[in-house]
Amino acid sequence: VETVECAQRGTRVVLHLKDDAQEFADPYRLRALVRRYSDHIAFPVRMPREGAATLEFEVVNQAQALWCRPRSEVTDQEYCDFYRHISHDGADPLAWSHNRVEGKREYTSLLYVPAHAPFDLWQREGARGLKLYVRRVYIMDNADQFLPLYLRFIKGVADSSDLPLNVSRELLQQNADVEAMRAALTRRALEMLTKLSTDDKEKYQDFWKEFGRALKEGLHEDPANRDKLLPLLRFASTVNAENTENVSLADYVARLQSGQNHIYYLIADSHAAARHSPHLELLRKKGIEVLLLADQVDEWVMGSVTEFEGHKLKNVARGDLELGALASEADPV
């Protein structure tokens, strides 16, 4: 053991490259790798500046992660800029949710609701999911294990402090931490949509036009969160002349006739066909509102919905309408 002088603190790591790996000695290739995998780690990565007459070093990574900063220190513009960076979308998001979880499990999430549906939204096997980081180190794109399929339009980042750096897609499918994060992030995404629906009805209407059909799938696929999904639904209705889907179940309940116990709806090939259906005649005469559904998935998803706030949902094309106090002897049987 002897004492030696070292110009700087730290550890020197020398990497010897094989002949078929010389590309990793190329400065441009190295910069690209650093920016992809280590752009957000807490430490600066420096490389010799290209074209400098003397040896100069420059930082090639950001050395910070926006999602690790306190929400109070991040501006709306920074959130929007980061969304465009990770999504390659030119439009600002409709909403976002930034959260840090500490305790038994530690992770940070930053979720976004896009303004427009991607071209492959209806390709259920297409690329989807969040960008996954572990302790700020980039792991993979399209980590689809953290949100259910009906929320495939959500963009964002999940950064875990508990997962191993060498995590694989196979390991993600069999991990208790991932299951817990999936449940929590699903709740967080639905809370974000609920807040948007109450705080900005116009923006939520824009969201529904783009993603409403996908969100409906959750009624069938995610029974645990059905009660959170039901208030988010929007329908066309006989109370409106237009076929705009802007009526919530809460709106319907608030307009119930005296003595009316059920929520009535009708499924048809189009809203126009629904409006001209003979099944509506009796209810129109009694001034009872009927929700009009015309999506291809409606027959499938509405089979999973039985009631809302104590009121049964009844398809007017099937069986007894159970009008109760609103019935009269002149009504057809």
Task: Name every feature range the model reports, one short phrase each.
Residues 1-333:
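Conserved GHKL (Bergerat-fold) ATPase module
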